[in-house]
Amino acid sequence: MTSSSANGRSHDRTVVTAAVLNYEAGNVRSAQRALLRAGAQAFITGDGDEAAAADLLVVPGVGHFGQCVRHFREAGFEDLVRRRLAEGRPLLGICVGMQILYAGSDEDPGAEGLAMLPGHVRRLPGDVVVPHMGWDVVRVVRDDPAVAGLDGRRCYFTHSYYADPADDAHVVAVCDYGPGFPCVVRTGPALGLQFHPEKSSDVGARMLHDLVAAVADGRAGAEVTSVRASRRVGGGHTS
């Protein structure tokens, strides 16, 4: 599947194709349905060539870090994603689907992540209830076309670990649960979400709609440099 870029708006905008990678990691159908509602021509695929042609590549994920990264490699998607990022084409990682793009995780220290994004996946500190489940506020700290209107809204979380980018400039939004943690990260064309947009009702639907619109407008892979507020996330990069 292919689609051309477009600068139109609303019904004149070229339809965005979105490939949801199927690698035995959980929420592929709910992610597909949410993207369809957001206006994308979304499809689930285990075929790398089919996925490579899509405008937006989606890596969902629910479960254990080590198992997910193993299934991802066994499905043959590692080279696909590496090429995607090298070409500067849009990619969305959701929950563990975002976490496996990093080098490693406290959840399974022996498992090698894909190491495509700089940073590490850390466990939420022991002085908060883990897992973190339910609705919580997202605070945007850097402008990004994919998160317009998300600041101060509640999204749905279910996790015990979070991605901690090596560079704070990659943090787009944070959640202030406990000492706080990054919940939206951006590294070039890759956007990662710790919350589940497909479970976040109207807020998640709006976020995915904005992302699809940004992909259609050719802006989704742009660097974001406008700092809106201090990050104010505790924990730093200590193990």
How should these model regions be labeled?
Residues 13-19:
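Extreme N-terminal starter segment of soluble prokaryotic enzymes
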Residues 19-21, 156:
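Conserved beta-strand elements of the Class I
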Residues 41, 56, 90-92, 154:
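Structural signature of beta-strand start/N-cap positions in the alpha/beta core
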Residues 42-53:
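Short acidic low-complexity segments
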Residues 51-61:
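Short acidic/histidine-rich motifs immediately flanking catalytic phosphotransfer sites
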Residues 62-135:
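Cysteine-nucleophile active-site neighborhood
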Residues 103-179:
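Pocket-forming structural segment of enzyme catalytic cores
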Residues 163-239:
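C-terminal and late-domain segments of enzyme folds
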